[in-house]
Amino acid sequence: MMNRVVLVGRLTKDPELRYTPAGVAVATFTLAVNRPFKNGQGEQEADFIQCVVWRKPAENVANFLKKGSLAGVDGRVQTRNYEGNDGKRVYVTEIVAESVQFLESKQNGAGGSTSNNNQSETNYSNDNKTSSYRADRSQNGDSFANEGAPVDINPDDLPF
């Protein structure tokens, strides 16, 4: 059996950091994740997904992410229940994050950075040397930016 979730979205409000009686940090936040299609009116819809993260990553989330920050979450789905104030059973489904990636740099105003946000250049090439991939990290961290230059793709290299 497998219970694995990977999400990318924006925080709907600042994370809430609390500590258990044993002193363990826990942060909760809601991630707005766009659906991959538009509705009948041509509008992009989003799902609002509750997330929880524990220990040191919880403190990092609280310190570096804020409302509107772009984040990637890798974790699992968990359903729990409790008795509400009115005596009715309340069910909560949330994502327990095993890791949270900060997908924007501080320069973009998001308040966080990725763990691999160096200003380096990486070159990759395949065995037959017919094509190569060059990723240049620009100042804004967009590794896909090419300053409007045409992309050189050999049709023989496409899988379709």
Swiss-Prot record:
Record's subunit section: Homotetramer.
Pfam families: SSB (PF00436)
Keyword DNA-binding: yes
Organism, scientific name: Listeria innocua serovar 6a (strain ATCC BAA-680 / CLIP 11262)
Keywords from the UniProt entry: DNA-binding
Biased composition, class Polar residues, residue ranges: 106-133
Name used for this protein in its record: Single-stranded DNA-binding protein 3
Domain SSB: start-end pairs: 2-104
GO function term, MF aspect, one: single-stranded DNA binding
GO BP: any one term: DNA replication
Classification via PANTHER family: SINGLE-STRANDED DNA-BINDING PROTEIN
Region (Disordered): 106-160
Gene: ssb3
InterPro entries: NA-bd_OB-fold, Primosome_PriB/ssb, ssDNA-bd
Cellular component, GO annotation: nucleoid
SUPFAM superfamilies listed in its UniProt record: Nucleic acid-binding proteins
Gene3D superfamilies on file: Nucleic acid-binding proteins
